[in-house]
Amino acid sequence: MGMTVADIRRRKQAERLSRLHQQASLVLAKQPGGSLWLFGSWARGDWDGFSDVDVLAVAPNRSQASELADAVLDQEMADDVLALTDQEWQERRNGDDPYWRAIGRYALQLGLS
């Protein structure tokens, strides 16, 4: 029996996540102290052919977070990158805003340095 659409989607998501983990390792090797998180449709698993890749670049301070976000863009591993400090990430993912709570619920850590 052939592959189902669900099988193909799982395979494509696994391939994309594998590439993102590899790219995250390269970026984080040069940016110590940070972490990268996938969020949005690719993290939730409801992506389609038009979905972009959304990444959070999290670091101890604003300067490091911005440098990490720039490195993600330079590596071309994401379409949209948000830079947050560790404190901002913890406050937002655990706060009252339903948008950020949803991001925190489904975000997948791509790497930690």
Predicted regions located by residue number:
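Catalytic core of pol beta-like nucleotidyltransferases
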Residues: 1-37, 44-50, 58-113
